[in-house]
Amino acid sequence: MRRTFVVLLVSLLVITGCSPPPPPAGAETVVLVHGLGRTRVSMALLGSRLGDAGFRVVNVGYPSTRAPMEEIVELLRARLEACCTALDRLHFVTHSMGGIVVRRYLAEYSTAHEGRVVMLSPPSHGSEVIDAFADSPLLRVLLGPAGTGLGTDSASIPNRLGPARFELGVITGNRTVNLINSWLIPGPDDGKVAVDRARVEGAAFLVVPATHPFIMNRQDVAAEVVSFLRTGRFTRRELPDSAGTG
C-alpha cells in the first residue's frame, strides 16, 4: 500500500500534462486520456508504469462533466498541438469516455498521428446505465452534455462514430461492485459497460477480471498495454483472476 502511494505521488509530480521530463533517446510518446468524472490523477499509476517501460508520457486532463464532446475534442487538439506536433508517432491510452474522445479526435484529425491506441473499458456502443438515468435532471448535471450522450441508442455519440481506422486494442473488465448498475446491464459487465458493448469491430480484444473504475491500476493490464503499443498484439485472450488488482 505504501509503495503504491509513493508511486502515485511521484507520478503526480512527474506526469504533468504537456510538460513531461526529458524522455530517453528515441522514446515514443503515449497520451493518456481519462474517463468521465475523473481527472489525470486516475491515470497516474498507469502513466508511471508506461514511463518505466521507456515511453514518454503526456497525461491530459479535460472538463469531462462540463463541456460538450465537440469542445473536448478541440481542447485535446489544442493541447496536443502545444506539446506534440513535432513527433512522428503518437500513441493513445484511454479509459472509459476517453476512448470516445480519442475516436472522435482521430476521426477529425486522422492524419495527425501514426501510433497505436489502447482503450480501457470504453463504452464503444454506449451504456445501459446512461439510458436509465440520463433523463434525471440531477444526473444530467452530474454527467454533463458529453456523458449524457453515451447511451445505447443509434443517435448516441459512440454509435455515430465511424470505423476505427487505426491500430486499436480494447481491454475491458467483467467484475462489478455496483449491483444496481449491473442489474441494468445484460450479460457480463464491469459495473458501467457491458463486455459486448466495449468491443470495436476489427480491434484486438481482451477481457480481464477488473471493475470499471480501477482497471487502469492493474499491473497485468499495464503489461498488456505495453505489449500492444510495442507489437500491436496482446499476449493473451483473457487474464486470470489472480493477476493484478482492481
Predicted regions and their residues:
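Serine-dependent carboxylesterase/thioesterase catalytic core
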Residues: 24-34, 40-41, 45, 51-63, ...
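Alpha-helical transmembrane segments and their juxtamembrane interfaces
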Residues: 12-13, 44, 71, 131, ...
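Helical cap/lid subdomain of alpha/beta-hydrolase-fold lipid enzymes
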Residues: 107-246
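Sec-dependent N-terminal signal peptides
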Residues: 4-14
